[in-house]
């Protein structure tokens, strides 16, 4: 039979000849069609899972998938009948020669193995041909073996195709890593043993490339001793070993696959391994080589500091570990490679690393025997299966492969070609670390990672959901099956810890159900088929939705079914299940769906980690995030947020009961170690919980348990932690916290009552800080700090960023942040400008945040000691999704967004951080970092940051960051407004409903004596006694009648305030004005609508509340003044009248009435109000606190602002006329018209020079400074002495036109003034000069001293200076 494969993007044209063979019912000697004792190692199973062969040669053609003839990867389930295709005939009838070839493969190779042959049977020759997928070469395989001619011809064709596709297609880094793994695994020769378990050698000439030939091309091979250099650590002795996942000791790294890495294991008392680049490895020759290596590294150091660091001796914490590694390396150097590998290769038990028992014993580390490790690991696996007693069809595919590898490894123990660095994986308890081990100094995570099959199947579905889009984008031409295989290849490269990140709520429940299944019966096996067929057992699942869960569990069971029929289609069902999750509501539980692999979210249900973190002292701890390692030294940092993310997710699941109306179960935390677990509850008043170990107890005490404080009756204050003075307990029953009254008064959330006080742990600080007047009610789940009286509502909206969640209802708040010495990003920093005026100078800096102010801008004096801004005193904290400015290092203040720790990439989550720190995302640069409250401040609308925004380098990045920050700020603002609107539309803000005014503080309510109440003249026989249409004297004077005084008695209709006769109204949500009040029936003009009631406060309290409202940006408040000593505040307490809005054209008015001697305010209709109309009144009546608040009443005469008088009809008409009036045309002045011409000579002496001009309009006088008696120019507007009286300086009325002499009315009498012919007057001085022949001299009218007219008390100004000609 001959058929050809046409050329396609996935294959190279080949002609394959196959001989028709007789089918037999037995396969490899099994009577029932099943393989028995067929031992196939892991390399073979991996290879077979990636080879594509026809299930039946009788079909005549090969399978086609998506139009392609060959596929690069297929699961092992599709090839389970491979033996029926190849090994036909009787058992051991054929001499099959398996040769797996790969070009450019450098790795470990083992001698090939063959099965027995039988004379007379046709010979089957298998050759795997190199195929191409998207222009990328895969491995080779085909059924042939005629010599080197076919090989060289195929190599030539492959080289041509490879060169062609390399020019046309771009290489994929992620795909290349999978490609290399496939090449390496294909190069490893697998061993298939006969039913009799006989090992038959293979002729070496059957394979042109053996593993030994490939090893000669590599610089290092398995078992070689090397020095490795990892940043931050000295040169360390290592041994090259094979990676337990890739089953290879080398791989190519980098964008162009130009850098080679080797897998090494570090010598020492802690088993740790890593991938190291070849340039960081040097062959090990002895300890004396260390100094030389340090000197060579120092010569290549880029900076002097780095050089000093490299030459520095090994620190004390690493010295013991390093010296032990040197001893082990020198011992290994004296051994042969096989002995070295046998003794020093790590044991991979389960998913953990362990030292060889012999090495651990020499190092003084106590470990369990290997047999006990295997026994103890059986409980953590799915079930302990005996290969000899359980049929192979009852073993799942994954576990069957593990069993085959175990048996294969045992049989290959004496084979020198067998790789001993990859023993069978067994779950084992971690051995005790050595004292000097850096990994031993790490805090363990408290629970081992799960490896249950139910979890693995569910995790794979989540993995497919998240990363399907990525793979499809990289391989658009691939079919669905190919995408499934690529995803499976990526999944197989992850270790158990990385796989655990893809847990879901469903996988948790399935895992628990699997554990129950494993405990049923004798523990030997589980009947998945029976459980899948019996849906009655699903009733035990308590979580909702049941229907979707049952469907998912059914699909997961189908994936794990062992029968041949379901194994063939399991991978397709997994694809369908994963894709269906995208279109169902289950995507809500998979919050990380459709996110790239780099930024995937962390697992929401992994085991919670312990608080605290210690820096690793091993070289492998400095590996990059892309390196794959199973060593304990590569575990993520055990930061407070690790447990925070998990606890919050678990809390959100458990809180569903409370959403259905049931109270959530309280989770207690130990008061000593602040951790959860099995706790002992105190039955005393403190309601505390403790671990037995924390109390020093070995077992639970009998009877009633009380802690030491409750037993002694001396409790410590929860704030100051001291018990010297008297403490009082919170009145809430289950609280149990004690406080000094002085300490608890410092917190504004403390509520004092008649029986005591309610502590701040029962109110949300975020809700109070955002709206102190109307905070959100304390109902709902609260998360309380275990160290101080701070509490928040559960959820990201209220919980402050930086809080460490230690239980579903317990946190450690950000107030307990401790700055570490030597860390620059922990230092506090303040801005260099005022937050009010944006100017520098002498600033008052906040001690908790970067805020700074001028004391004058805050209207306060410069305080002594520490000072905190208003926001910090009020308890305002940053929340997730807040846009902020961050100061990091030497960079400018940079815009960023506060991120939740579970929404950042895994490498950012692993960064070491303290309680109170939170991750931020920098706009523009797309970077992340951990920071805290003292280095950030909120972003405000309109912020522009630094003015230095260039078009190159960091300036351009900063400009883009500002644009991104502004867009994100507006987006988050709209989201929050929509959420607040949705919440506010449900019901009005909370307040306390009262019926009459409640006095506050010193305010009193007056009550008059009955004899003082006026009596009206109404009679009970009148039609409407004391009604609105009657002539009741009390009604006219706005007095309410008293029932014991009014003649009408019970028929009196002037008792609306006392009887509260209000028309029926309802509260509604208005457009743009918040909540309002509408009438439900028609209201007549003058009818009483409602009484305005609230808290009665005095003026001092009123001003204090207004000041507090201004400081905290509270705008929704209204104070109504009754008289000088009493003001009504209806904010915290009131009735329906508090919802009435303002209007410049209202339908109600406020009137002061006297009721039983006390003044009260009533609302009366000023016009007929139909039903459904909103009730409004004018707030301008004796109101305080409204400063230019925009009015939104929409009336025609709206003034625009609250507090301003509404526009009258006259003003409206004048405005209309003004708008219609045309602008008057103005006559243009001629050039020079209206300008005055100043004199060029001094008005006193008549000479020219530098003159001072008078600033008075139309005055042209000019003077010398010496003539005015001045030494410098006058400042400001200056008028010459001619305009002021020479005696008193008042404005002059009589002027001399020849000199500056002038006088006012009072002093002009007695002065001789004469007039010239042109009407100008002159003084007597000029008359004497004119008439020199006169015999009689006129006496001077004023002393000589008064003639000095330049020295005036008024401020003068220089206006203009001219030069005389």
From Swiss-Prot:
Ligand binding (Zn(2+) 1): 1016, 1018, 1026, 1032
Residue stretches making up the PWWP domain: 222-286, 880-942
Composition bias, Polar residues: 603-623
Reaction(s) catalysed (UniProt annotation): L-lysyl(36)-[histone H3] + S-adenosyl-L-methionine = N(6)-methyl-L-lysyl(36)-[histone H3] + S-adenosyl-L-homocysteine + H(+); L-lysyl(36)-[histone H3] + 2 S-adenosyl-L-methionine = N(6),N(6)-dimethyl-L-lysyl(36)-[histone H3] + 2 S-adenosyl-L-homocysteine + 2 H(+)
Residue stretches of biased makeup (Basic and acidic residues): 552-567
Residue numbers binding Zn(2+) 3: 1144, 1191, 1193, 1198
Induction pattern: Induced in CD4(+) T-cell in response to T-cell receptor (TCR) and CD28 stimulation (at protein level). Induced in B2-cells by IgM antibodies or lipopolysaccharide (LPS) stimulation.
GO MF annotation, one: chromatin binding
The enzyme's E.C. designation: 2.1.1.357
Biological process according to GO: atrial septum primum morphogenesis; atrial septum secundum morphogenesis; bone development; membranous septum morphogenesis; methylation; negative regulation of transcription by RNA polymerase II; positive regulation of isotype switching to IgA isotypes; regulation of DNA-templated transcription
One CC-aspect GO term: nucleolus
Region (Disordered): 149-169, 373-455, 513-567, 594-658, 1206-1232, 1329-1365
Protein's UniProt keywords contain Membrane: no
Residues recorded as bearing Phosphothreonine in the entry: 110, 114, 422
Chain positions recorded as S-adenosyl-L-methionine binding sites: 1075, 1115-1118, 1141-1142, 1186, 1192
Function text: Histone methyltransferase which specifically dimethylates nucleosomal histone H3 at 'Lys-36' (H3K36me2). Also monomethylates nucleosomal histone H3 at 'Lys-36' (H3K36me) in vitro. Does not trimethylate nucleosomal histone H3 at 'Lys-36' (H3K36me3). However, specifically trimethylates histone H3 at 'Lys-36' (H3K36me3) at euchromatic regions in embryonic stem (ES) cells. By methylating histone H3 at 'Lys-36', involved in the regulation of gene transcription during various biological processes.
Description of how the protein assembles with itself and partners: Interacts with HDAC1. Interacts (via PHD-type zinc fingers 1, 2 and 3) with SALL1. Interacts (via PHD-type 1, 2 and 3) with SALL4. Interacts with NANOG. Interacts with OGT. Interacts (via HMG box) with NKX2-5.
Membership in a protein family: Belongs to the class V-like SAM-binding methyltransferase superfamily. Histone-lysine methyltransferase family. SET2 subfamily.
Record's protein name: Histone-lysine N-methyltransferase NSD2
Gene responsible for this protein: Nsd2
């Amino acid at each position: 039979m001959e058929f050809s494969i046409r050329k396609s993007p996935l294959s190279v044209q080949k002609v394959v000849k196959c001989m028709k063979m007789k089918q037999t019912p037995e396969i490899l000697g099994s009577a029932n069609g099943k393989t028995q004792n067929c031992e196939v190692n892991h390399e073979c199973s991996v290879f077979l899972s990636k080879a594509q062969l026809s299930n039946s040669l009788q079909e005549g053609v090969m399978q086609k998938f998506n139009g392609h003839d060959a596929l690069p990867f297929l699961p092992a389930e599709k090839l389970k009948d491979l033996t029926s295709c190849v090994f036909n005939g009787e058992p051991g009838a054929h001499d099959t020669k398996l040769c797996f070839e790969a070009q450019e493969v450098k790795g470990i190779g083992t001698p090939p193995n063959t099965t027995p042959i039988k004379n007379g049977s046709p010979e089957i020759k298998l050759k795997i041909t190199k195929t191409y997928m998207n222009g990328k070469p895969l491995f080779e395989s085909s059924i042939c073996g005629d010599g080197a001619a076919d090989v060289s011809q195929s190599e030539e064709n492959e080289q041509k195709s490879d060169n062609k596709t390399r020019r046309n297609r771009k290489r994929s880094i992620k795909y290349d890593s999978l490609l290399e793994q496939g090449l390496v695994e294909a190069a490893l020769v697998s061993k298939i043993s006969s039913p009799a378990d006989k090992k038959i050698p293979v002729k070496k000439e059957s394979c042109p490339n053996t593993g030994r030939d490939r090893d000669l091309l590599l610089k290092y091979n398995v078992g070689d001793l090397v020095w490795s250099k990892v940043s931050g650590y000295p040169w360390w002795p290592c041994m090259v070993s094979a990676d337990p996942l890739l089953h290879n000791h080398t791989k190519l790294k980098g964008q162009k696959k130009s850098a080679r890495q080797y897998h090494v294991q570090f010598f020492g008392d802690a088993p740790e391994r890593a991938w190291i680049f070849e340039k960081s490895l040097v062959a090990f020759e002895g300890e004396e080589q260390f100094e030389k290596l340090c000197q060579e590294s120092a010569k290549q150091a880029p900076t002097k500091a780095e050089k000093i660091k490299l030459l520095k001796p090994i620190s004390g914490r690493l010295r013991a570990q390093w010296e032990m590694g040197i001893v082990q390396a020198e011992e290994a150097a004296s051994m042969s490679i096989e002995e070295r590998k046998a003794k020093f290769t790590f044991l991979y038990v389960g998913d953990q690393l362990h030292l060889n028992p012999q090495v651990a014993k020499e190092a003084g580390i106590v470990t369990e025997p290997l047999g006990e490790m295997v026994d103890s690991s059986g409980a953590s696996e799915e079930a302990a299966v005996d290969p000899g007693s359980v049929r192979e069809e009852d073993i799942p595919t994954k576990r069957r492969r593990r069993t085959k590898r175990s048996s294969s490894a045992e049989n290959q123990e004496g084979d020198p070609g067998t790789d001993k660095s990859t023993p069978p994986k067994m779950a084992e308890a971690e051995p005790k670390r050595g004292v000097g081990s850096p990994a031993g100094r790490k805090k363990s995570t408290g629970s081992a990672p799960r490896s249950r099959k139910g979890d693995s199947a569910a995790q794979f579905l989540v993995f497919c959901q998240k990363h399907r889009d990525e793979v499809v984008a990289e391989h658009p031409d691939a079919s669905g099956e190919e995408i499934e295989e690529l995803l499976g290849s990526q999944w197989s490269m992850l270790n158990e810890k990385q796989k655990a990140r893809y847990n879901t709520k469903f996988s948790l429940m399935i895992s628990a159900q699997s554990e129950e299944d494993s405990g049923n019966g004798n523990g030997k096996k589980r009947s998945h088929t029976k459980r899948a067929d019996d849906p009655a057992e699903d009733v035990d699942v308590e979580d909702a939705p049941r229907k979707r869960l049952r469907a998912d569990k059914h699909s997961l069971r189908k994936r794990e079914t062992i029968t041949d029929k379901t194994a063939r289609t399991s991978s397709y069902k997994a694809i369908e299940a994963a894709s269906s999750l995208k279109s169902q509501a289950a995507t809500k539980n998979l919050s990380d769906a459709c996110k790239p692999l780099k930024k995937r979210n962390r697992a929401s249900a992994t085991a919670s980690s312990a608080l605290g973190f210690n820096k690793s002292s091993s070289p492998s701890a400095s590996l990059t995030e892309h390196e794959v390692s199973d060593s304990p030294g590569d575990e993520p940092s055990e930061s407070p947020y690790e447990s925070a993310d998990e606890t919050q997710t678990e809390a959100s699941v458990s809180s569903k009961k409370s959403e259905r109306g049931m109270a959530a179960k309280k989770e207690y935390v130990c008061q000593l170690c602040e951790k959860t677990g099995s706790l002992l509850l105190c039955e005393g008043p403190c309601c505390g919980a403790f671990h037995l170990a924390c109390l020093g107890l070995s077992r639970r005490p009998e009877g009633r348990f009380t802690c030491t404080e409750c037993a002694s009756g001396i409790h410590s204050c929860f704030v100051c932690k001291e018990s010297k003075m008297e403490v009082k307990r919170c009145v809430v029953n289950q609280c149990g916290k004690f406080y000094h009254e002085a300490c608890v008064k410092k917190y504004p959330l403390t509520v004092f009552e008649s029986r005591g006080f309610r502590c701040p742990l029962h109110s949300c600080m975020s809700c109070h800080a955002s709206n102190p007047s109307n905070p959100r009610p304390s109902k709902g789940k609260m998360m309380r700090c275990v160290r101080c009286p701070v509490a928040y509502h559960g959820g990201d909206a209220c919980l402050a960023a930086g809080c460490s969640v230690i239980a579903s209802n317990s946190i450690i708040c950000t107030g307990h942040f401790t700055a570490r010495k030597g860390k620059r990003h922990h230092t506090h920093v303040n801005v260099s400008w005022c937050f009010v005026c944006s100017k520098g100078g002498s600033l008052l800096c906040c001690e908790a945040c970067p805020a700074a102010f001028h004391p004058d801008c805050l209207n306060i004096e410069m305080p002594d000691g520490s000072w905190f801004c208003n926001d910090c005193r009020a308890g305002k904290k940053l929340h997730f999704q807040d846009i902020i400015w961050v100061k990091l290092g030497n960079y400018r203040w940079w815009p960023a967004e506060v991120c939740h720790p579970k929404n950042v990439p895994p490498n950012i989550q692993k960064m070491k951080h303290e309680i109170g720190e939170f991750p931020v995302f920098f706009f523009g640069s797309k970077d992340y970092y951990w920071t805290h409250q003292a280095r950030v401040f909120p972003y405000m609308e309109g912020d522009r940051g630094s003015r230095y925004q260039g078009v190159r380098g960091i300036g351009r990045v900063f400009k883009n960051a500002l644009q991104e920050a502004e867009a994100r700020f507006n987006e988050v603002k709209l989201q929050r407004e929509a959420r607040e609107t949705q919440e506010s539309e449900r019901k009005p803000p909370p307040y306390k409903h009262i019926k009459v005014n409640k006095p506050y503080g010193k305010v009193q309510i007056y009550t008059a004596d009955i004899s003082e109440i006026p009596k009206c003249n109404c009679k009970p026989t009148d039609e409407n006694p004391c009604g609105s249409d009657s002539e009741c004297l009390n009604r006219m004077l706005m007095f309410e009648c008293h029932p014991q005084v009014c003649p009408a008695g019970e028929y009196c209709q002037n008792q609306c305030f006392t009887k509260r006769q209000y028309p029926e109204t309802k509260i509604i949500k208005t457009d743009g004005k918040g909540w309002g009040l509408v009438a439900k029936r028609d209201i007549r003009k003058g009818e009483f609508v409602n009484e305005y009631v609230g808290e009665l406060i005095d003026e001092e309290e009123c001003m204090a509340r207004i000041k507090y409202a201004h400081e905290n940006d509270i705008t929704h408040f209204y104070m109504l003044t009754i008289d000088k000593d009493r003001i009504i505040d209806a904010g915290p307490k009131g009735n329906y009248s508090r919802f009435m809005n303002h209007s410049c054209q209202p339908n109600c008015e406020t009137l002061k009435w006297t009721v039983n001697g006390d003044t009260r305010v009533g609302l009366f209709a000023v016009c007929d109000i139909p039903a459904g109309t909103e009730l409004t009144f004018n707030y301008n009546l004796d109101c305080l606190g409204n400063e230019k608040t925009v009015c939104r009443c929409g009336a025609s005469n709206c003034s625009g602002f609250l507090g301003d008088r509404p526009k009258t009809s006259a003003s409206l008409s004048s405005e209309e006329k003004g708008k219609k009036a045309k602008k008057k045309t103005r006559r243009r002045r001629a050039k020079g018209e209206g300008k005055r011409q100043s004199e060029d000579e001094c008005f006193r002496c008549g000479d020219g020079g530098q003159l001072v001009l008078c600033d008075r309009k139309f005055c042209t006088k000019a003077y010398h400074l010496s003539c005015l008696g001045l030494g410098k120019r006058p400042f400001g507007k200056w008028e010459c002495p001619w305009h002021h009286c020479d005696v008193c300086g008042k404005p002059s009325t009589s002027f001399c036109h020849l000199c500056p002499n002038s006088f006012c009315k009072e002093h002009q009498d007695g002065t001789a003034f004469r007039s010239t012919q042109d009407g100008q007057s002159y003084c007597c001085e000029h008359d004497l000069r004119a008439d020199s022949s006169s015999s009689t001299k006129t006496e001077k009218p004023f002393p000589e001293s008064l003639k000095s007219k330049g020295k005036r008390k008024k401020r003068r100004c220089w206006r203009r200076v001219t030069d005389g000609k």
